[in-house]
A protein has these predicted regions:
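Low-complexity, acidic Ser/Thr/Pro-rich "mucin-like" tracts of secreted and single-pass surface proteins
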Residues: 1-513
Length: 513
């Protein structure tokens, strides 16, 4: 074929043999100028074809059977292959070096759970952009990679989650480590990530019970350059309440979540998550599975055809957001209305719905709307947030572009609670945080009030709210003799943009005897 060159590829496994097709299925040629990748289907380690002249990354994955059973995996990686004439390339897995992740704690091992607790990603500059070119789960089978480079932007990134003896649950500590194995634009001859505990953020983490026996687990995954998805590995915390020392590589963005269920099978559960960055080594404190829970910062959008994508995480805490409906053991509904009460549309999920605004009249500007949501939760792992009722008001008009954000107000709470999410029957300070869409600046609040109930919302009394150097704060004195009772909260907020929220949260937290 004119304008192309013949390419012959021969692959060898770690025993120096041509692998069976099932053990090495394809070879990838990725043009360094960013053009489309070309795949070649291997036939027992061999393929021939033709490619345009140029410079390519060449890679293949090779499984080698072990005499004792199982297989090893080798990523054979060539960071720069010049195709300027007919050529043959031999991809030899015997050149692979073992990848490993470790810390300076002798009993710390990669977890043996799903995915194996370790992950490797290769990134390289392709077409002027940092690009993920290969990724591998370190799942317990021996894993190797061939040294390569130097090449612009080339890096082998390793991430691991390590526990005591690799325990999948119940370890008193969890290491979350991530980083490049070299700073020289190469895949080195020793592709290992070695981390000292003193170099990490030490995060003392408290997991609270929510009024009922419960079990929890967590995922953590680092953000990588080069695009692609974040890979998080699971570790079980065990029965609650519990405290754990969790170590994190500082300076990296981590996606973390907590899964809370009635037992450690977690077949039904509530999930909250957040993105965290610990800027430097040192000691930090954080809380998980802590109330009050309620509507968090939204993800609402308005499309130019008038579609409102109403997406509010309904069981968020001060420091972590829940997912979106549907939720386990939760029922409810959401309704969009005009300002005069005419129902536009209704969904059968709390905090969630795709609605269409009415066609605007000629010359009309923004119109006023109201969204109401109700959520009812009967979760065997939690007595918190058993009922929510929220009214939002806002004004909107169809955007001239494809879409625009539709940020609404919410108020989240933080207060000192014990390991069962209970407050003392004494003076109590409650921090209030008015929030809106996570990509929007903080709202400027014109008015904020709080009411409190000790009988599940049958009666309410006002609580004084003030703005201090630390933000909005309310002070209440909980009544004595409230054993087994719960505190419910009702907040009203209005900002300078004219948006309002009136939100009722039944069972925000419990009271101590």
């Amino acid at each position: 074929m004119a304008g192309t060159h013949a390419v012959t590829v021969d692959v060898l496994d770690r025993d120096g043999k041509a692998p069976q097709t099932a053990n090495a299925e394809y070879v990838l040629f990725r043009s360094l100028d960013g053009a489309a990748s070309e795949y070649g289907q291997l036939d027992n380690g061999h393929v021939t074809g033709r490619l345009a002249p140029g410079e390519y990354v060449v890679e293949t994955g090779v499984h080698t059977p072990k005499p004792s059973g199982g297989k090893s995996f080798t990523l054979v990686y060539v960071s720069r292959f010049v195709l300027d004439k007919d050529r043959t390339v031999v991809l030899d897995a015997r050149k692979g070096r073992p990848m490993s992740i470790g810390v300076d704690r002798p009993d710390a091992r990669l977890t043996g759970g799903e995915g194996g607790g370790g992950y490797a990603r290769v990134v390289q500059t392709i077409g002027g952009q940092t690009t993920t070119t290969a990724s591998i789960f370190l799942d317990g089978q021996p894993a190797y990679i061939t040294p390569s480079g130097p090449a612009p932007g080339l890096s082998l990134l390793l991430q691991g989650r390590l526990t005591k003896d690799g325990a999948a649950t119940g370890s008193p500590y969890i290491y979350n480590v991530a980083g490049s194995v070299s700073d020289q634009d190469i895949i080195p001859a020793e592709p290992a990530l070695r981390v000292r505990t003193a170099e990490l953020a030490t995060v003392n983490t408290r997991y609270r019970r929510q009024g009922r026996p419960a079990c929890a687990g967590t995922h953590a995954g680092a953000h990588w350059p080069g695009g692609g998805y974040t890979t998080g590995f699971y570790v079980g915390i065990g029965s609650l309440p519990a405290t754990r020392t969790e170590y994190f590589s500082p300076g990296a963005d981590w996606d973390t979540d907590t899964v809370l269920g009635a037992d450690c099978r977690l077949e039904e559960a509530g999930v909250t998550g957040t993105s965290e960055l610990f800027p430097s080594a040192g000691t930090y404190d954080r809380e998980r599975t802590t109330g009050p829970l309620g509507a968090g910062a939204d993800f609402n959008t308005l499309l130019n055809d008038g579609t409102v994508q109403f997406w509010v995480p309904m069981f968020s805490s001060w420091s972590a957001a829940s997912g979106l409906a549907p939720y386990d053991r939760v029922t409810g509904r959401t309704t969009l209305q005009t300002a005069d009460g005419k129902v536009i549309a209704t969904s059968d999920q709390p905090g969630y719905g795709d609605f269409t605004l009415p066609e605007p009249g000629r010359g009309s500007g923004e119109a006023a709307y109201k969204v109401t949501t109700d959520a009812y939760r009967q979760a065997p792992w939690s007595d918190l947030a058993t009922r929510q009722h929220i009214d939002w008001t806002f004004s909107a008009t169809r955007p001239s572009g494809d879409w625009t954000g539709l940020p609404l107000l919410t108020v989240l709470y933080r207060t000192r609670l014990d390991d069962d999410n209970r407050a003392p029957t004494t003076t109590q300070h409650i921090a209030l945080s008015p929030r809106t869409n996570q990509d929007e600046p903080a709202p400027t609040i014109r008015r904020l009030t709080l009411q409190i109930s000790y009988d599940d919302g049958t009666t309410w009394e006002g609580a004084p709210v003030s703005y201090t150097q630390h933000g909005w704060e309310a002070t209440v004195r909980n009544p004595s003799g409230s054993n087994g009772k719960y505190v419910s909260l009702r907040a009203y907020a209005e900002d300078t943009a004219g948006r309002t929220v009136d939100q009722t949260l039944v069972h925000a937290y419990g009271l101590k005897p």
